[in-house]
Structures are given as C-alpha cells and as structure tokens.
Amino acid sequence: KAHFHVDGVQALGKIPMQLEDVNSISFSGHKFNGLKGQGILIIDNKEKIEPTIFGGGQEYGIRSGTVNLAMNVSLVKAMEIAIQNLNELNHRLSRYNKVIRECLGQYKGMYINSPENSAPHILNIAFPGVKGEVLVNAFSKLDIMVSTTSACSSKREKLNEVLLAMGIKDNRIAVSYTHL
C-alpha cells in the first residue's frame, strides 16, 4: 500500500477537506494568515517517518529542537479563523474571480484557462505570443502583482517540467487570491 501524502498548502481555509484516506498532509501557515516560517505536518502513523534532525526528541522525535510555543499558538488561531471563515471567503473570492473574468474577457487574444467552476482563489490566464516575463512587468506597472511561477519555484530558470508535459507554454500566468 502506497503512502498517500497531500500537499495542502493552498487548501486550508479555501476548500473543504476530507482526510479519511490521507496518510499525511502538509500546510503552510502564511497561506492562511499565519506567520511565515510555520508549517503543519499531520501524519496518520508517526512510526512511518524517520527523523532528519536528531536531538532532544521534541515533536514526537520527528523533529528535535525547542518548540516555539508562541508561534504554534498563533498558527492554531490562524487555522481556526481560516476554517471558520471558509464559506465567507469563498463567496467573496468567487465575486472577485467573476469580476476579473469579466474585465479580462474584454481583451481579444487572451484566454482564461481555469474552468468557470474551478477553485475561486486561483485563475490561470494566457496571452498567446506574449512571454510571461513581459506580462509580469506590465501588470506590476498597474500595481497588480502576478507571477509566472509559484514562490517556491521562482528561482528556476526554465518552465516546470510538469507544466511542459501538460502543454502549458510560458505565456501563461497564474493569479491566486488570498485572505484579502
């Protein structure tokens, strides 16, 4: 039986989650208004995980080091608020998404790749014939911050191999809205 891990970084506070068949899931605090540098790893069976940092045995022996109680408490509070406000946030982001789609729909030669019924907090758009870097610069002059990559892969020189395999070119940008 394979270990089923879910990268839930974009999920917490944005989509309802059912974790019955998940062996592990990870979240990043800053994606739901926690502090940067915080994360959560939930594992169904901690015996399956080998520690990478050895020492005092904190964090159930999986990650030794002094526990930052203040950061942990703030992370739990941010998580509670994100889950509590999920429906309200999705309603607001759906409205933003609709307005942005309507505005972008006025421009010829521009494609919205995200389906109408997709997650309301992410929008993938393409401008055939225009490189992503040019789009980022043009939008930034309008004080609209967009990216051609995720923050965790922004140092890469080339397009993500998975996106290339999906036939996605470098003329697309992804817009993700957060807890505004």
Residue ranges and their predicted role:
Residues 1-28:
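Conserved PLP phosphate-binding loop immediately N-terminal to the Schiff-base lysine helix
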Residues 21-59, 64-76:
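Active-site PLP attachment segment
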Residues 25, 109-113, 146-150:
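A short linear hydrophobic-aromatic micro-motif
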Residues 69-80, 101, 136, 140, ...:
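Predominant activation on well-ordered alpha-helical scaffold segments within soluble catalytic domains
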Residues 83-135:
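Conserved PLP-dependent catalytic core of the aminotransferase class-I/II
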Residues 123-173:
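Conserved C-terminal alpha-helix-loop-beta "cap" of PLP-dependent enzymes
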Residues 178-179:
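Conserved small/polar residues in nucleotide/adenosyl-binding loops
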